[in-house]
Amino acid sequence: MKKNKRLMVMAGGTGGHVFPGLAVAKQLQEQGWEIRWLGTADRMEADLVPKHGIEIDFIKVKGLRGQGVKRLLAAPFQIINAIMQARAHMKRWQPDAVLGMGGYVSGPGGIAAWMSGIPVVLHEQNAVAGLTNQWLSKIAKKVFQAFPGAFPNAEVVGNPVREDVTQLAAPTERMQERQGPIRILVMGGSQGARILNQTLPEVMAKLGDDYSIRHQAGKGSAEEVNAAYQANGVANADVTEFIHDVAEAYAWADLLVCRSGALTVSEVSAAGVGAIFVPFMHKDRQQALNADHLVDCGAAKMIEQPDLTVESLTQQIQQLDRQALLTMAEQARGAAKLNADRVVAQAIVALTEKR
């Protein structure tokens, strides 16, 4: 017979879904809750979640966007099968609530929870709600959104951000006395970003020794990107596939050049670092909309991908001296919502106390 309250987190695919889920999970673990994860075996959660001491159950589910006719015809059967798999996991473990953080797994998982009478809590990380969360919002007991506009009446709480990022020293304390080369941190998300990998080596060649760079290239790309820096005469580039201590990297940086996925935008703000965002080209401009509020308040610049060239990025970076970067960093920190993980965790506790 179980004693502690139990939460099943449904999240997968990318760091933008998984890391916020881990942040909420940590809040509840500190209150004595047991946490289990629902994910897919072939995405990053399969490796990442167990490293945080959380057991994970898998279901078989894939996205439908861009699939051929054959896959689309088979989709209803695959979705039903995924719902049944999720329901079996929930029946065995008996969670008191489930938290949907996005990714393909959330749809079948949310429906399975609803069918089982388990309260569903949703958090939408992006400024434009994904199709899965649009559906699940109709059956969820509580819906949160990171940015205004994803849902008409949902509470705006920001994105749950890792505690080591929120606890970084203030920008003034970190940056005011810095001297030497301006430090550029390039992050394309956990999967990297090809256009940043291709553009930055040439940009750094133009910028010269007044700048230093650390570059997260993404899985399988570090060797190629490092070779591009070498070919452009940039000998001191620090290139890695994945930055594990992201808080330390933010603390090191004077400027980020990055995509504007939901988690990245929230972490940039929480850390207090100025950024040049290059949004991924979604049809609905999701990433551009994620970053708009930081651009509007002077915390960031944005170059839309069709406008990104070696020249345009070089020019934008050269316009930002240390004082401008410090001002951007302070504006970013001032815009941050730092308690999303606690707010979501408290809502889950309150929901289960009513049962």
UniProtKB/Swiss-Prot annotation:
Associated pathway:
Cell wall biogenesis; peptidoglycan biosynthesis
Main site of residence?
A: membrane
* Topological type in the membrane: Peripheral membrane protein
Q: What class of enzyme is it?
A: transferase
Mind telling me which SUPFAM superfamilies this protein's record contains? Answer: UDP-Glycosyltransferase/glycogen phosphorylase
Q: Which reaction does it catalyse?
A: di-trans,octa-cis-undecaprenyl diphospho-N-acetyl-alpha-D-muramoyl-L-alanyl-D-glutamyl-meso-2,6-diaminopimeloyl-D-alanyl-D-alanine + UDP-N-acetyl-alpha-D-glucosamine = di-trans,octa-cis-undecaprenyl diphospho-[N-acetyl-alpha-D-glucosaminyl-(1->4)]-N-acetyl-alpha-D-muramoyl-L-alanyl-D-glutamyl-meso-2,6-diaminopimeloyl-D-alanyl-D-alanine + UDP + H(+)
Q: Where in the cell is it found?
A: Cell inner membrane
For the ligand (UDP-N-acetyl-alpha-D-glucosamine), the binding residues are 14-16, 126, 162, 190, 243, 262-267, 287
Instruction: Name the keywords, alphabetized.
Output: Cell cycle, Cell division, Cell inner membrane, Cell membrane, Cell shape, Cell wall biogenesis/degradation, Glycosyltransferase, Membrane, Peptidoglycan synthesis, Transferase
Per UniProt, what is one Pfam family of this protein?
Glyco_tran_28_C
Is Cell cycle one of the keywords? Answer: yes
Per its record, what are the GO molecular function terms?
UDP-N-acetyl-D-glucosamine:N-acetylmuramoyl-L-alanyl-D-glutamyl-meso-2,6-diaminopimelyl-D-alanyl-D-alanine-diphosphoundecaprenol 4-beta-N-acetylglucosaminlytransferase activity; undecaprenyldiphospho-muramoylpentapeptide beta-N-acetylglucosaminyltransferase activity
InterPro entries attached to this UniProt entry: GlcNAc_MurG, Glyco_trans_28_C, GlycoTrans_28_N
Q: Does the keyword Cell membrane apply?
A: yes
Its Enzyme Commission number(s) read 2.4.1.227
Q: Which GO terms describe its biological process?
A: carbohydrate metabolic process; cell division; cell wall organization; lipid glycosylation; peptidoglycan biosynthetic process; regulation of cell shape
Q: Which GO terms describe its cellular component?
A: plasma membrane
HAMAP family in UniProt: MurG
Q: Which PANTHER family match?
A: GLYCOSYLTRANSFERASE, UDP-N-ACETYLGLUCOSAMINE--N-ACETYLMURAMYL-(PENTAPEPTIDE) PYROPHOSPHORYL-UNDECAPRENOL N-ACETYLGLUCOSAMINE TRANSFERASE 1
Question: Which family does this protein fall into?
Answer: Belongs to the glycosyltransferase 28 family. MurG subfamily.
| Known function | Cell wall formation. Catalyzes the transfer of a GlcNAc subunit on undecaprenyl-pyrophosphoryl-MurNAc-pentapeptide (lipid intermediate I) to form undecaprenyl-pyrophosphoryl-MurNAc-(pentapeptide)GlcNAc (lipid intermediate II).
Its recorded name reads: UDP-N-acetylglucosamine--N-acetylmuramyl-(pentapeptide) pyrophosphoryl-undecaprenol N-acetylglucosamine transferase
The species is Vibrio campbellii (strain ATCC BAA-1116)
Q: What is the lineage of its organism?
A: Bacteria, Pseudomonadati, Pseudomonadota, Gammaproteobacteria, Vibrionales
- The gene coding this protein: murG
